[in-house]
Amino acid sequence: MAAVAARAGGLLWLRAAGAERRRCGLRCAALVQGFLQPGGEDTAQKRRVAHFTFHPDPESLQYGQTQKMNLFQSITSALDNSLAKDPTAVIFGEDVAFGGVFRCTVGLRDKYGKDRVFNTPLCEQGIVGFGIGIAVTGATAIAEIQFADYIFPAFDQIVNEAAKYRYRSGDLFNCGSLTIRAPWGCVGHGALYHSQSPEAFFAHCPGIKVVIPRSPFQAKGLLLSCIEDKNPCIFFEPKILYRAAVEQVPVEPYKIPLSQAEVIQEGSDVTLVAWGTQVHVIREVASMAQEKLGVSCEVIDLRTIVPWDVDTVCKSVIKTGRLLISHEAPLTGGFASEISSTVQEECFLNLEAPISRVCGYDTPFPHIFEPFYIPDKWKCYDALRKMINY
């Protein structure tokens, strides 16, 4: 069914794809930067991950045998599990047939065939629209947008079609089996068009879920939950962690519940909230605060941005009386604003200091000035110290 729908929709799509090839020059630029060169990401990431140290999760034995994987390998494992379990599942996007820019789909075309893992034109709107059509037939559509920065041409398809399909049909039809994957966040050399964190744009859109993992173990479990969820999901993958993050990951499929934040370190004085790569930054901040100030920090990984876990965050703030939220995206209109607003409504009388947001600047993402742009541990530590002294 999925293959028939793919071929039928593909014929119409290919006729209109010519105007969408605007990124050929950018692809060449990406080659020069090292995105597509074998090992290119390794060199860049080893050179530029000084703003954080990856903290692996403790090995979990409850899901059976584990294997050492980096983040992109855990993504591959999740996709492999999905294709093996669900004969209707298909994976498609730019260059996914040869393994993708970051190698997340490597080997899957050879294993499952060209009708289930295939390339698309350079047309994000078409990729997502195509995925909606696949999902409406009842098949499982796993679409890849090559970089989160290029998801915006597909904004109309995501916001006005995928998110509203079930609602506008009175639940007669839905495209809930659509999952959109996209590499996300800073990478050390991505500059304006390969570094953005656009989660807040989609947080304002009822009908979709937005998920961002912090580690290989989390990535596999959360991605499998997204793929099997009954709602369209956007799964943003921190690309700086593709190779920098390595830990033991179960070989067999397992799921981590969506919309459940995780308290990864308990504390009593300050609540620190982040997601994706920034979780590792605030974990370092928590250690610095304990060592230098004697301050006990509770660290929360939000994991699901929409719908987010209000109860876990508010319960923590009621205990600590202070909240610091950090993300790479710009400050104004960032998702930290939504968390801050909700917490002050729910926990106002418990707050001991103003809520602090430590985020990217309200500028385009810079290239050589990336180290000054990102909300590193020193910026977070300074903000925490101000809260303590308030």
Curated annotation (Swiss-Prot):
Signal sequence residues: none
Major site of localization recorded for this protein: mitochondrion
Entry-linked InterPro entries: THDP-binding, Transketo_C/PFOR_II, Transketolase-like_Pyr-bd, Transketolase_C
Residue numbers binding thiamine diphosphate: 150
Keyword terms: Acetylation, Lipid metabolism, Metal-binding, Mitochondrion, Oxidoreductase, Potassium, Transit peptide
The reaction(s) this protein catalyses: N(6)-[(R)-lipoyl]-L-lysyl-[protein] + 3-methyl-2-oxobutanoate + H(+) = N(6)-[(R)-S(8)-2-methylpropanoyldihydrolipoyl]-L-lysyl-[protein] + CO2
Cofactor(s) named in the record: thiamine diphosphate
Keyword rRNA-binding belongs to the record: no
Location of the transit peptide in the chain: 1-48
EC number, as in UniProt: 1.2.4.4
Positions that bind K(+): 176, 178-179, 226, 229, 231
Residues carrying N6-acetyllysine: 230, 239
Places the protein is found: Mitochondrion matrix
Single biological process term from Gene Ontology: amino acid catabolic process
A GO term from the CC aspect: nucleoplasm
Keyword Metal-binding belongs to the record: yes
Molecular functions (GO terms): 3-methyl-2-oxobutanoate dehydrogenase (2-methylpropanoyl-transferring) activity; branched-chain alpha-keto acid dehydrogenase activity; metal ion binding
Quaternary state and interactors: Heterotetramer of 2 alpha/BCKDHA and 2 beta chains/BCKDHB that forms the branched-chain alpha-keto acid decarboxylase (E1) component of the BCKD complex. The branched-chain alpha-ketoacid dehydrogenase is a large complex composed of three major building blocks E1, E2 and E3. It is organized around E2, a 24-meric cubic core composed of DBT, to which are associated 6 to 12 copies of E1, and approximately 6 copies of the dehydrogenase E3, a DLD dimer.
Record function comment: Together with BCKDHA forms the heterotetrameric E1 subunit of the mitochondrial branched-chain alpha-ketoacid dehydrogenase (BCKD) complex. The BCKD complex catalyzes the multi-step oxidative decarboxylation of alpha-ketoacids derived from the branched-chain amino-acids valine, leucine and isoleucine producing CO2 and acyl-CoA which is subsequently utilized to produce energy. The E1 subunit catalyzes the first step with the decarboxylation of the alpha-ketoacid forming an enzyme-product intermediate.
Name of the molecule in the record: 2-oxoisovalerate dehydrogenase subunit beta, mitochondrial
